[in-house]
């Protein structure tokens, strides 16, 4: 693909307040996933992946269990996905994914993040075409060919595989996520996968102009503070 995948996830927040926000976002996402697809992780593969991801991010078991109990009880909030696109400070392409029970409130909250930092919120699709919706797996290794061969034998559709500085990154269509994950776990049972997610990968990265760097970080921080924002994707070269 001619580019390296940049994992820019913030490390686990150290302050109690920030941790609570992370737990809240996972709790909401697990609740929605379980409510829509069932609370049994063995039957709901998306839920199984989400729980695994939450545990990797050190989300306490009681947060996960509470979300599952809430989903099993029926009723509760009716969260809907919402996506907003636009250009952040410095012209950086941005996709903001939310879960909301009040679309008007969420739109206004996200819009204020754009407005207060001189950014521009756009119409649906305005920047999505600049990203590839991919399944991404990343782990330590030095022989990418053996992994590619194993995935080909498992009839997995692989978009690209890269080796850089002792780290192997596998890209596949987002629809192939569970197929690739199963093949890796089956063929390489001792493999420790550091990143396994469905994400929007920028087709090209853009440097943030020096004069916009502080404002861009403020923009990201404001979005992170929005209760309904679940994930932010951008093409900034950090």
UniProtKB/Swiss-Prot annotation:
GO terms for cellular component: cytosol. GO terms for biological process: regulation of DNA-templated transcription. The keyword Transcription applies. The keyword Nucleus does not apply. It holds the Pfam family TACO1_YebC_N. Keywords: Cytoplasm, DNA-binding, Transcription, Transcription regulation. It is found in: Cytoplasm. PANTHER family: TRANSLATIONAL ACTIVATOR OF CYTOCHROME C OXIDASE 1 (PTHR12532:SF0). HAMAP family: Transcrip_reg_TACO1 (MF_00693). Belongs to the TACO1 family. This is Probable transcriptional regulatory protein VVA0010.
């Amino acid at each position: 693909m001619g580019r390296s995948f940049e994992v820019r996830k913030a490390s686990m927040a150290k302050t109690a307040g920030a941790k609570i926000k992370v737990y809240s976002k996972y709790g909401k996402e697990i609740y929605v996933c379980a409510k829509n697809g069932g609370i049994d992780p063995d039957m709901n593969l998306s839920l199984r992946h989400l729980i695994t991801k939450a545990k990797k991010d050190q989300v306490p078991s009681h947060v996960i269990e509470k979300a599952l109990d809430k989903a099993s009880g029926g009723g509760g909030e009716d969260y809907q996905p919402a996506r907003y696109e636009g250009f952040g400070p410095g012209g950086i392409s941005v996709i903001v994914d939310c879960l909301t029970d009040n679309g008007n409130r969420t739109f206004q909250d996200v819009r204020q993040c754009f407005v207060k930092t001189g950014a521009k919120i756009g119409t649906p699709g305005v920047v999505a075409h600049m990203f590839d919706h991919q399944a991404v797996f990343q782990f330590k290794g030095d022989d990418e060919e053996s992994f590619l061969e194993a995935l080909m034998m498992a009839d997995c559709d692989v978009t690209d595989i890269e080796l850089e500085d002792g780290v192997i990154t596998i890209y596949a269509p987002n629809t192939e996520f569970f197929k690739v994950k199963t093949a890796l776990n089956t063929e390489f049972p001792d493999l420790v996968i550091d990143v396994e997610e469905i994400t929007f990968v920028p087709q090209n990265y853009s440097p943030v102009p020096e004069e916009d760097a502080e404002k861009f970080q403020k923009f990201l921080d404001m979005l992170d503070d929005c209760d309904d924002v679940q994930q932010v994707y951008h093409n900034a070269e950090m």
